[in-house]
C-alpha cells in the first residue's frame, strides 16, 4: 500500500529543473527530457541511442561545442566527459554537436533551475510532469527495458579514468578548503585568546578599583573613629565648661554643629545615593514615635515595634532605596502605617480581603494603582482619595503575588512553622507628619490631564491612558490631592524636630554574644519626662533643647536627619501636608486636536473659468501661491498676499476642459487648502487666441472678416511707421535725397518703377508681334540654337511639398519585425514568441509610446502602450530628524547641609544625569530631563542647624506641548522621475513610476527608463518640514547637522513617537532650560523655536528663487517646478514572451469625432473617435505613409477614445485605414489646430512641471503657408483674397491718415484763432 501511494505521488510531481536532449536529421526530430537527479549513465545511454536512431553518429569525430564556445572536432571517446560537465553544472549549460549545414545534430541542455524533486525520471518537456522511469541502472551499464550494455569498452575505461581524475581534483580542492578552514580556526582561537586576556585585564582593573574603594572605606571609618574621639573630648570639655559657667550660651553649640552632625550622618556618606541597596543609615530601624509598623495586633511581632536587629519583612522591604527612594530620602519621617498606629491618619473601616469580598467598590481605587510586593507577605496598604489608610489582605496562609494584585498559596518548607508573615507593604512611596496645615484655597489643577485614578479633572473627547509616577499630598478634610509640579522644602527647627535614642546592649554589665544597639524612646528620658528614670545625653541639637549636664548618661539621643517639617508649595503658598509622596497610577491625558490638520477642501471658495485662467476668490484668507494640475501637467502662480488669484490653465485645459486640482497657500494660521474646479471645453480659437500677439496673427483660421481687416490695417500701419523712422534716419545721415524722406516718396518711386517696367515689357512684346506680321524690315540673321531647358516644375514642386501634412500618433511607434517574432499554429489560434529589445522616446505628458506586435495574418496585432502620466522633479532626502514644541517643568527640594545628598561640596559637582533621592520615584518616565543643584543660604535663618549652604535640588524635564510632531529634512539632490500607465499586450494595465536609471519587471518583460536632464540648485538655504498628519512646509534656513539654540531643531529625535513622548534618546542643544533659584523654589523657563508656527507660515506651495515647491502626487515628499525639460528614452525588453492571436475576425466601426489642440507644440492635439464593437479588440489605424498611427485596446459596446497626436501644420486632413482584426476601413481625420507660440508672457514666476521630450520640430513657415492656401481655397483664391485684404487695409490706412491730417489742421486753426 505504501509503495502504491509513493508511486502515485511520484507521478504527480512537477519537475522544474531538467535536462533536455534534442536530436534531429533531415526526416525527423526527437525531444526527450530528464529530471535533475538523472545519472550520467542514463544521459550517455540516451545520447548514444538517439545518435544511432537518427544515423547521426557515423564519423569518428564530431564538431561540438559547450555553451557559447567555438566549435571543435571532438572524438566520440571523449564525448562522455563533456556530457559529464553538463550533468555536474548547477547553472544553465548546453552541449551541441551538429554537421556543417545544420541538417543533423544533437543538443543536450540543462536549464539551470532548482527544485526539490529527487529521483531519475523521464518527464514531459513542456509541463514537467512525470512520464516514466529513466530505465538505466546507476553503475550497472544496463537498462530495465532490456537494452544491451554499451559496446564501446574503451569509452567505459576512459570514463572511469576521468572519474578518478575528477575525484583526485575534488580531493585536492577539499584539502585546500581544509587548510583555509584551519587557518580561520587559528585566527578565531587567537581572537578568543585576545578577548580572554582583555576580560582578564578588565577583571584585574575591577578588583583594583574594588580594593581602592575598600581602602577608601577603611580610611573613612578610621577618620570617623578619630572624629568620634574628638567629639567625645569636646563633650567632656563642654561639660566642664558648663559646670564652671552657670549662664549657658549658644556660641559653642553653633561652633560644634558641623562636627556633631558629621558624626550622626557619617554612615550616609559611605553609601552613594544612587546605590540600589538597603538604606545605610545605622539607625533606620530606630523609628520616630512608637515605631509600631502594624495594622492590628495580629501583625508580625517583629514589626511591633521595629527594633535593631529584628526582622520585619514589610519594613525591611521599604528600606530598599530603589523601591522607595522618597521614603529613604526622608528616613526620619514616619511611614503611612506608622502614622496610622500613632493616630496621625485614620483608616477606612472596611478591610478588603481578596477572595472573600467580591464587591468591586472595595478594590475600585486599588485597581488603578500599580505596585511591587516581596514574597511571604499577606497584605498591602495605601492612602486612598479620602486621605485614609486602606488595607487589602489575603486569606490565612496565602501570600501576595509580586504585582500585589492576587493571592496564592505556597507549600511550607520542611521544619517551617510559618510560611507567610502577617505584615504589609505600601503601594505608595510616601511619608507622613504631625500637625499638618489646613487648606481652603481653590481646587488644584492638573494641566492636560483628564483623570488620575478615580479623580476626574475634566471631560476629554480624545485621551490616552498610561501608568505614570505622580506626586500627591494629603490634607485634612481635603483628602488626596495630586500635584503636577512638586516643590518642597525641609527645614530644621529645634522646637519641631524628632529624636531617636539608643543604648548599647550589654552596658548593664550582662554578657552578650553580639555587639548591638537597643532602641529607647525619647519619652523615657528623665529630662523629657521627669517621671522617667533614663539619664539621656545627645548631640548638640538634643542638648540645646534639653539639659544634658545633670549626671552621667545612660542613653544617647540624636536628632533624626531631615525629620524637620516638610512644606509643599501649593498655588504659591507653603503648606505643611499630612502626607506626601509618589504613586504609580493610571493617568488619562488629553490628546489635543492636531494643530497641523491635513489639507482641507475649501468648499466656500468661489471659482470662475476666465480666458486668462481660473479666477479663485477666498473666504477671507490671503492667497500667496497657487498650483493647478490637470492631466499630469502643473503650473503655478505666485503673488503678493491677496484674497483672489488667477491661475493659468495647465497644458491644453483652456480648450479641452475638465477637472483642475488647485492647491492654495495663504497667510492664515492653518495649512494650505485644496479645491477642485471643473472648466467646460471651449473653442481653441477663443481659448488660445489673441489679437496683439504674433501667434494670434498666425492663427488665421481664428480671424473673422473684421479682425482680418483690422490685422491688415495694423500690419500696414506698422510697416509705415518702421519705414518712416528708417527713411528719416537715412535722410539725417545724408544717404537719401529729400524726395525719399517720406514713405509716400518711396511709394511713388516704386509705382514709377513698376509703370516703367510695365511700359518696357509692353514695348518689347509689341515689337516682337510687329516683326512676326512683317510690319518691320527683315534682316537675315542666323538663328542660334538654344538648348531647351528641362521642365523642373519648381512652383508645382514647392506647393506640393508645403501642402504635405505631418503627423505623429502614439507619439512614437515601433512595429516588431519578422526577426523578432516567431509564430506557430496551435489549433485554431496562432502562438507567437517574441524576443526583442526596443528603444523609443517617451511621449509628452498625456501622450503614448507604442510597440506594435503584428501577427502572421493580416490585421492581427497586439500593442504595448506606455502613456506618460506625469513628470516630477522630486527631492532626494538627506539628513532628517523629528521635533515638536516642548515646555519645561521643574521639581525642587531644598535640604540643609549634611541632610540627604547635601554633603561636602557635592552640590557644586552635581551632574545633569545625577538624580537626587527625593525625585528617584520619577526616574522611570524615560523623558528628557536634567538635574541641577544650587547652593542656597544656610544656618538658623534659613531653617537649618548647619551654617554651611543648603542645597536646592532641581529635577527639570521637557514634555511635548502637543500630541504631534514634524519631521525636518534637507534635500541633498533633486532627481527626475516619470509616471507611466503601461498597458501590456493582453490589455493588463499597471501604473509605473521610474527614475533614472530605473527598471520595472512586468509579467511580459521589463521596462527601463533613462533620462537626460539637469538638476536644480540653490536649495541649500532651505529646509523642509513634514507633518505627521500630512502635508509639507518650507523654512528659509539651511539644514544644520548640530542642534543649536535659537534655530529650528533645538531638540531632535530619531522617530515620531520619540518626539511626541519627549524621549530621553532625543538630542538637544545645551542650555535650553534657564533657571532662576529663589531659596526654597525654582523658576525654569525655555524659549524654544515653535516648529508648528513655522509649518503654518511656510505651508506648501511656496515659491523661492523662481521655483515653486509643492508636494508630490503620492504626498510622500516634495517636488519642484522649474520650467525645465527632460529627454526620456524607454527601453522595452521581451525575452521569449508568448502571445496568442485568436484567429477570429473581429469587426468594429469607427467615426471621427473631433481634433483639438495645437500644432508644432509640446502638448499636441487630442484626436477623438467613437468606436463600436461587439467584443473587446485592438483598434489600429494608420495612414498610407505610416506617419500617423492610432492604436489602443477597445471594449465591447460604443465608447469614445482619445489619443494625443503631434502635427506640424494647422490644417489636419488625414485619411487613415483602420481595423480591429477584419478588413480595413477608411476614416478621415479633419480639423484645424492653433499655434500656441513658444513664449508665454503671462506671469510664470512660480514655474511649471517638467516637460518630457519637448517638441524638437520648430514652427515652419512652409507648413503654415500651405495650410493658409488650403484654408483659403487654393493658391489663386488665396492670392486674390490676400490682395483684397491688403487693399482694404491700405484704404483704411489712407482714410486714417486723412482723418489724422484733418484733426491736426483743425487744431492748428483753433490755435491761430
From Swiss-Prot:
InterPro entries reported in the protein's UniProt record: M_polyprot_prcur_phlebovir (IPR016404), Phlebo_G2_C (IPR043603), Phlebovirus_G1 (IPR010826), Phlebovirus_G2_fusion (IPR009878), Phlebovirus_NSM (IPR009879)
Gene name of this polypeptide: GP
All ranges on the Cytoplasmic side of the membrane: 734-791, 1300-1313
Protein name as catalogued: Envelopment polyprotein
Intrachain S-S bonds: 303-312, 352-362, 373-404, 394-407, 432-579, 450-460, 501-557, 525-536, 543-548, 602-605, 609-679, 629-634, 810-850, 823-832, 875-971, 890-1084, 896-944, 902-951, 907-933, 937-942, 1053-1066, 1148-1220, 1158-1161, 1168-1202
Signal peptide: 1-17
Site (Cleavage): 271-272, 809-810
Family: Belongs to the phlebovirus envelope glycoprotein family.
Superkingdom of source: Viruses
UniProt-annotated site: Important for glycoprotein C and glycoprotein N subcellular location, residues: 1311
One Pfam family cited in the UniProt record for this chain: Phlebovirus_G2
Annotated region (Fusion loop), positions in chain: 896-902, 938-949
Region (Internal signal sequence for glycoprotein C): 793-809
Amino acid at each position: 500500500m505504501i509503495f502504491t501511494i509513493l508511486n502515485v505521488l511520484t507521478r504527480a510531481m512537477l519537475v522544474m529543473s531538467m535536462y533536455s536532449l534534442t536530436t534531429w536529421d533531415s526526416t525527423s526530430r526527437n525531444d526527450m527530457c530528464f529530471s535533475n537527479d538523472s545519472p550520467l549513465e542514463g544521459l550517455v545511454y540516451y545520447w548514444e541511442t538517439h545518435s544511432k536512431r537518427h544515423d547521426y553518429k557515423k564519423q569518428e569525430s564530431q564538431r561540438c561545442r559547450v555553451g557559447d564556445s567555438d566549435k571543435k572536432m571532438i572524438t566520440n571517446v571523449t564525448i562522455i566527459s563533456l556530457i559529464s560537465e553538463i550533468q555536474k553544472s548547477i547553472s544553465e549549460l548546453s552541449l551541441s554537436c551538429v554537421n556543417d549545414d545544420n541538417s543533423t545534430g544533437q543538443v543536450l541542455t540543462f536549464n539551470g533551475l532548482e527544485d526539490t524533486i529527487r529521483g531519475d525520471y523521464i518527464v514531459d518537456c513542456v509541463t514537467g510532469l512525470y512520464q516514466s522511469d529513466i530505465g538505466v541502472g546507476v553503475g550497472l551499464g544496463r537498462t530495465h527495458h532490456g537494452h544491451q550494455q554499451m559496446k564501446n569498452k574503451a569509452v567505459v575505461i576512459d570514463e572511469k579514468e576521468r572519474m578518478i581524475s575528477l575525484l583526485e581534483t575534488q580531493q585536492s580542492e577539499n584539502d585546500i578548503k581544509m587548510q583555509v578552514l584551519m587557518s580561520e580556526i587559528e585566527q578565531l582561537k587567537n581572537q578568543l585568546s585576545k578577548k580572554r586576556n582583555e576580560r582578564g585585564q578588565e577583571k584585574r582593573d575591577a578588583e583594583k578599583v574594588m580594593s581602592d574603594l575598600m581602602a577608601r572605606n577603611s580610611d573613612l571609618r578610621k577618620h570617623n573613629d578619630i572624629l568620634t574621639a574628638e567629639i567625645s573630648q569636646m563633650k567632656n570639655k563642654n561639660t566642664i565648661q558648663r559646670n564652671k559657667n552657670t549662664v549657658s550660651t549658644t556660641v559653642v553649640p553653633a561652633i560644634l554643629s558641623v562636627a556633631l552632625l558629621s558624626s550622626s550622618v557619617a554612615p550616609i556618606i559611605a553609601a552613594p545615593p544612587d546605590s540600589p541597596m538597603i538604606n545605610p543609615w545605622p539607625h533606620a530601624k530606630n523609628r520616630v514615635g512608637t515605631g509600631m509598623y502594624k495594622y492590628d495586633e495580629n501583625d508580625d511581632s517583629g514589626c511591633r515595634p521595629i527594633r535593631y536587629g529584628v526582622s520585619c519583612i514589610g519594613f525591611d522591604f521599604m528600606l530598599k532605596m530603589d523601591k522607595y527612594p522618597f521614603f529613604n530620602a526622608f528616613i526620619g519621617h514616619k511611614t503611612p502605617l506608622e502614622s496610622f498606629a500613632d493616630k496621625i491618619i485614620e483608616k477606612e473601616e472596611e478591610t478588603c480581603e481578596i477572595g472573600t469580598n467580591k464587591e468591586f467598590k472595595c478594590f475600585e481605587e486599588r485597581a488603578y494603582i500599580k505596585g511591587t510586593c516581596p514574597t511571604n507577605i499577606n497584605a498591602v496598604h495605601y492612602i486612598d482619595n479620602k486621605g485614609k489608610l486602606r488595607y487589602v489582605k489575603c486569606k490565612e496562609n496565602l501570600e501576595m503575588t509580586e504585582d500585589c494584585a492576587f493571592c496564592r498559596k505556597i507549600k511550607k518548607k520542611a521544619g517551617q512553622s510559618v510560611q507567610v508573615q502577617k505584615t504589609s507593604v505600601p503601594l505608595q512611596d510616601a511619608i507622613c507628619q504631625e500637625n499638618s496645615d489646613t487648606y481652603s484655597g481653590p481646587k488644584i489643577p492638573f494641566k492636560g490631564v483628564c483623570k488620575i485614578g478615580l479623580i476626574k479633572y475634566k471631560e476629554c473627547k480624545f485621551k490616552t491612558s498610561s501608568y505614570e509616577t505622580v506626586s500627591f499630598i494629603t490634607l485634612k478634610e481635603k483628602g488626596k490631592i495630586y500635584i503636577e509640579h512638586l516643590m518642597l522644602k525641609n527645614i530644621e527647627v529645634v522646637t519641631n524636630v524628632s529624636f531617636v535614642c539608643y543604648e548599647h546592649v550589654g552596658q548593664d554589665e550582662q554578657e552578650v554574644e553580639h555587639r548591638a544597639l537597643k532602641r529607647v524612646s525619647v519619652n523615657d528620658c528623665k529630662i523629657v519626662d521627669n517621671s522617667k528614670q533614663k539619664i539621656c545625653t545627645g548631640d548638640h541639637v538634643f542638648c540645646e533643647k534639653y539639659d544634658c549636664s545633670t549626671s552621667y548618661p545612660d542613653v544617647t539621643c540624636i536628632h533624626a536627619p531631615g525629620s524637620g517639617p516638610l512644606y509643599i508649595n501649593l498655588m504659591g503658598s507653603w503648606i505643611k501636608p499630612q502626607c506626601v509622596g509618589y504613586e504609580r497610577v493610571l493617568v488619562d491625558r488629553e490628546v489635543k486636536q492636531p494643530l497641523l490638520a491635513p489639507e482641507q477642501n475649501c468648499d466656500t471658495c468661489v471659482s470662475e473659468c476666465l480666458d486668462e485662467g481660473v479666477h479663485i476668490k477666498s473666504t477671507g484668507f490671503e492667497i500667496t501661491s497657487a498650483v493647478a494640475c490637470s492631466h499630469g501637467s502643473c503650473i503655478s502662480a505666485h503673488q503678493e498676499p491677496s484674497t483672489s488669484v488667477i491661475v493659468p490653465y495647465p497644458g491644453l485645459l483652456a480648450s479641452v476642459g475638465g477637472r483642475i486640482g488647485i492647491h492654495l497657500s495663504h497667510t492664515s494660521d492653518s495649512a494650505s487648502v485644496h479645491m477642485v474646479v471643473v472648466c467646460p471645453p471651449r473653442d481653441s480659437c477663443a481659448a488660445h487666441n489673441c489679437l496683439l500677439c504674433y501667434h494670434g496673427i498666425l492663427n488665421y483660421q481664428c480671424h473673422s472678416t473684421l479682425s482680418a481687416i483690422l490685422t491688415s490695417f495694423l500690419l500696414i500701419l506698422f510697416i509705415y511707421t518702421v519705414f518712416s523712422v528708417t527713411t528719416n534716419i537715412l535722410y539725417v545721415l545724408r544717404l537719401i535725397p529729400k524726395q525719399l524722406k517720406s514713405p509716400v516718396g518711396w511709394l511713388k518711386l516704386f509705382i514709377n518703377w513698376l509703370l516703367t517696367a510695365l511700359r518696357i515689357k509692353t514695348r518689347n512684346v509689341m515689337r516682337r508681334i510687329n516683326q512676326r506680321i512683317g510690319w518691320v524690315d527683315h534682316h537675315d540673321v542666323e538663328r542660334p540654337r538654344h538648348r531647351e531647358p528641362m521642365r523642373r516644375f519648381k512652383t508645382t514642386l514647392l506647393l506640393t511639398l508645403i501642402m504635405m501634412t505631418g503627423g505623429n500618433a502614439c507619439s512614437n511607434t515601433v512595429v516588431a519585425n519578422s526577426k523578432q517574432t516567431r509564430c506557430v499554429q496551435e489549433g485554431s489560434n496562432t502562438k507567437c514568441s517574441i524576443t526583442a529589445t526596443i528603444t523609443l522616446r517617451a511621449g509628452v505628458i498625456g501622450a503614448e509610446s507604442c510597440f506594435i506586435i503584428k501577427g502572421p495574418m493580416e490585421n492581427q496585432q497586439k500593442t504595448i502602450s506606455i502613456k506618460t502620466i506625469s513628470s516630477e522633479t522630486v527631492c532626494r532626502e538627506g539628513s532628517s530628524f523629528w521635533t515638536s514644541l516642548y515646555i519645561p517643568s521643574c521639581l525642587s527640594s531644598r535640604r540643609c547641609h549634611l541632610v540627604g545628598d547635601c554633603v561636602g561640596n557635592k552640590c557644586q559637582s552635581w551632574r545633569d544625569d545625577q538624580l537626587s533621592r527625593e525625585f528617584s520615584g520619577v526616574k522611570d518616565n524615560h523623558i528628557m530631563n536634567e538635574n541641577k543643584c544650587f547652593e542656597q543660604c544656610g544656618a538658623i535663618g534659613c531653617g537649618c542647624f548647619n551654617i554651611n549652604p543648603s542645597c536646592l535640588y532641581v529635577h527639570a524635564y521637557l514634555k511635548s506641548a502637543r500630541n504631534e510632531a514634524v519631521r525636518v529634512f534637507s534635500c541633498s539632490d533633486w532627481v527626475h522621475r516619470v509616471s507611466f500607465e503601461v498597458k501590456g499586450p493582453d490589455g493588463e494595465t499597471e501604473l509605473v513610476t521610474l527614475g533614472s536609471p530605473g527598471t520595472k519587471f512586468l509579467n511580459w518583460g521589463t521596462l527601463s527608463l533613462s533620462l537626460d536632464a539637469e538638476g536644480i540648485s540653490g536649495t541649500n538655504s532651505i529646509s523642509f518640514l513634514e507633518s505627521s498628519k500630512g502635508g509639507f512646509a518650507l523654512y528659509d534656513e539651511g539644514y544644520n547637522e548640530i542642534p543649536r539654540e535659537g534655530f529650528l531643531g533645538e531638540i531632535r529625535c530619531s522617530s515620531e513617537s520619540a518626539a511626541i513622548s519627549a524621549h530621553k534618546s532625543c538630542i538637544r542643544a545645551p542650555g535650553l532650560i534657564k533657571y532662576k533659584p529663589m531659596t526654597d523654589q525654582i523658576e525654569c523657563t525655555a524659549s524654544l523655536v515653535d516648529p508648528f508656527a513655522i509649518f503654518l507660515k511656510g505651508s506648501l506651495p511656496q515659491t523661492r528663487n523662481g521655483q515653486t515647491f509643492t508636494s508630490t502626487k503620492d504626498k510622500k515628499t516634495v517636488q519642484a517646478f522649474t520650467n525645465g525639460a527632460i529627454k526620456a528614452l524607454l527601453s522595452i525588453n521581451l525575452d521569449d514572451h508568448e502571445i496568442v492571436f485568436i484567429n477570429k475576425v473581429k469587426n468594429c466601426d469607427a467615426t471621427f469625432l473631433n481634433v483639438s489642440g495645437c500644432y508644432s507644440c509640446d502638448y499636441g492635439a487630442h484626436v477623438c473617435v467613437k468606436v463600436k464593437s461587439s467584443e473587446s479588440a485592438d483598434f489600429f489605424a494608420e495612414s498610407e505613409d505610416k506617419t500617423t498611427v492610432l492604436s489602443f485596446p477597445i471594449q465591447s459596446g460604443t465608447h469614445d477614445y482619445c489619443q494625443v497626436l503631434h502635427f506640424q501644420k494647422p490644417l489636419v486632413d488625414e485619411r487613415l485605414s483602420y481595423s480591429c482584426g477584419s478588413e480595413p476601413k477608411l476614416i478621415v481625420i479633419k480639423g484645424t489646430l492653433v499655434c500656441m507660440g513658444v513664449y508665454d508672457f503671462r506671469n510664470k514666476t512660480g514655474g511649471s512641471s517638467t516637460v518630457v521630450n519637448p517638441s524638437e520640430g520648430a514652427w515652419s513657415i512652409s507648413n503654415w503657408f500651405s495650410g493658409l492656401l488650403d484654408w483659403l481655397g487654393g493658391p489663386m483664391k488665396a492670392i486674390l483674397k490676400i490682395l483684397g485684404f491688403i487693399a482694404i487695409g491700405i484704404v483704411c490706412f489712407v482714410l486714417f491718415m486723412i482723418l489724422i491730417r484733418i484733426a491736426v489742421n483743425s487744431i492748428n486753426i483753433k490755435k491761430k484763432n
